[in-house]
Amino acid sequence: MVLNYIQRWFKWVIPTFGFLAIHYIYIISLTIIASILLFTGGTTTKIKYIDALFLASSATTQTGLNSVDLNSLSIWQQFILYGFTAITVPIWMHGSISFIRLYWFRRKFKDVVRQNRTRKFQRKLRKSLMKKSEDDEEQGVRGRKIRVMLPYLHSLRSPTSLKNFSRFDTHDSTNNPYFPDNPPSPKADISKDEYFGKYLPKKSDTLDMDLESHNMTFHDYEPSIENKNYDFGSSHSASMQMYEMDDLHPRLRRQSSFISSVNPLEADDTRETLSEGALVQESLPMAYSYSDTNLVVSRDSFTLTGDDNLFPEGGLRPANTIDGIVRSSLSSSSLSKDTEPSTVDMHIAFTGLNKPTIERERNLKLRKKSRFYKKSLRSRFSRGLHRPIRWTKSFTSNRRNLTLERVLSSAFAKKREPSISSRHTTMSLPYLSYNPTVDRNSAFVALSKEQRDELGGIEYRALKCVCSMVTLYFIIFNIAAFVTFIVFAYTAVGSREVIDSYDLRRGWWALFSSASSFNDLGFSLIPSSFVPMNRNIFLLLISSLFIIAGNTGFPCFFRTFIWTTYKLYPFSFEKKEAMAFLLDHPRRCFTLLFPSGATWVLFFVLLLLNVIDLVLFMVLDTGSKAVASLPKGIRVVNAIFQSVCTRTAGFTSVSISELHPAVLVSYMVMMYISVYPVAINMRNTNVYEERSLGVYRTEDDEGKSFLKDHLTEQLSYDLWYIFLGLFIICICEGGKISNPLDTDFSIFTVLFEVVSAYGTVGLSTGLSSSNCSLSARFTTISKLVIIALELRGRHRGLPRAVDRAILLPSEKNNLKEEEDYQRRHGFSIDNARGSIAVSRD
């Protein structure tokens, strides 16, 4: 009851308020809850509610400004700051969006997901039953030896007969005894000799063939629509032998056993269980390709792949190989354009006899580069050796309604279809069965309903991948940060004295400081932050790494994390398809994951900003009191640490108030633009970028950039808040600012505090009388202004309502993409679909 009420409430709230409003509600609600807990949680000293609200706001927005000394708080109050920070960081928030979208995807396809789980359980059960010894597999199927033979070739012994006998009828039992109209059921009580004697040719009726020196291909045919006959090619051998299973390679015997062991009653599940190593096509017939190591059902039905070591030099090989997946020799061009696909029932091809090709060598090199190729193939064989295949000659009679499960497993199901005006159709893996029309920023347009469903399937799997990867990333980096800090706290020289001097437990200091670094909070239990430890190179550098990985550098680190996992970990092919789609079109699935080019741009921009801060620090602060006592090498490390903290965390390893005024100005500028690199990338890669800006470009504006539009919009939002906040605070703190004896207050220090709050950084010139931020001496109204600036600054750069990565699955999203495409290109989407349909025909 309660769950249904919550679901109805979310269904009403999300479309009504939009993502940004919900984000505000979430942050403000947690701020109020945290402030109440902080206000009531003090045991030794009580703090004012305005200070509790100020600390709670700094924690939930990751600002890091403190109006009271954190070391004076109780452990419970410190833990509240720690916990509420963890559930409001950008990684948590954007990851939660992915989980919510995944939940709605599952609700939309709940029946299909239930079927998917059932089939997955059946596959696991079947796999456990198939764990037999190697000797048992060598015996064939149910103790029988399997013969590989060509049907109805006993009359084609001479070349003359071969020319005269170009076709045979597959439905006439008198002319074609090897394709009976009513084959017996495998479950029928028929003896082996009786079955093979009735339906299979005798050994004397077979055609001998020298496999060492000839090619034989049966695909130059023009089948009759009325009779469904077969046409044999003109270049064939004059002799052929029947091969017993004992004469074949052991792996071929197992594969042949699998092909010959057919259970039509279980065939409905076959299309799902062979999704990793099989290709399924409904509209085209089954086609077989034979090699010395494979018995392959070709592209338009099933394909079973073999280990590379099993292919001898100069022997038979599969015709095509893409990324370790063996394709069949049957191409779409082999079918006549005027022929309906359903009129052909079988095709047998012998390809690659003693014919080394450039493609073969290239494929061999590609397979050797893959460390887990052989292992993955063996696992695929072990999963699929005894899986059933229908006796039926095509799958046209088994057509079912399109379901999500078939969408998820049909990446190779259909032949590639052309696209119109595609800006980008290159795919890391062929996760779609058609060549999509991909417009700006991964906008898929001019697609049919079936193509949209298939795109939704791969997007659903990519979304599952995002959820698992972002969870792993968050957990791994938090654990790694804690381990490094705990090692420092218990092993570093001098660390014990510093931590113990403030009556802190080293384990709790390590946990709090590591989370504060990775979550970019900037709070430190040591009142002077990192100043007492500014000579420890390890702590400063490792903290800088976690600070970058948790905030501004997260898109770069996260894409590298996904790409490395995609390359090294031996996933199933279905999961690799999802990861490939995620890397190709990241902004359809996750707000903080950018395409490769945009990620590199972000990386170099961040590097440039850090280098600028580093150079200014080293040049302008050479003789300042803050760094004069530090050796040159330690000074460089402190410069790196401070340049990183300027735009994110707000930690300090030197006294900020003692730095050169020009350095303080540069820090203020860096705090102001801290969110710009990520925000501009996020909006520039938005699928609905033009819709969010209200500006639509045409084909003539192809080379123009939207950077100017983004900057103009961002500045128009930001500057008003900053100057309005500064104006109100100057009114409230006018007496302190005008007092010449009060050195802590000036127009510049107040502006520095305002920009730090709006940029959610947390740097402050501080107070000479206490270890707090300048805000500690503000009046209540000024503190409320700082809180408002923190909340507004936390939400700048977030995606608007029109962002594909935050929208729930809906047909309206597809209409938005196509409307934008139509406005930009100036033609009807219906005409675009029509051109695609014509090209398919």
Curated annotation (Swiss-Prot):
Swiss-Prot/TrEMBL keywords: Cell membrane, Glycoprotein, Ion transport, Membrane, Potassium, Potassium transport, Transmembrane, Transmembrane helix, Transport
Pfam families: TrkH
Transmembrane segments: 24-44, 80-100, 469-489, 507-527, 537-557, 600-620, 662-682, 715-735, 747-767
Record has Transport as a keyword: yes
Molecular functions (GO terms): high-affinity potassium ion transmembrane transporter activity; potassium ion transmembrane transporter activity
GO biological process: intracellular potassium ion homeostasis; potassium ion import across plasma membrane; potassium ion transmembrane transport
Annotated region described as Disordered, given as residue ranges: 173-192
UniProt xrefs under PANTHER family: HIGH-AFFINITY POTASSIUM TRANSPORT PROTEIN-RELATED, POTASSIUM TRANSPORT PROTEIN DDB_G0292412-RELATED
Role this protein plays: Together with TRK2, defines the major, high-affinity potassium influx transport system. Involved in maintenance of the proper sodium/potassium ratio in the cell and in regulating the plasma membrane potential.
Protein name in UniProt: Potassium transport protein 1
Lineage, highest ranks first: Eukaryota, Fungi, Dikarya, Ascomycota, Taphrinomycotina
The encoding gene: trk1
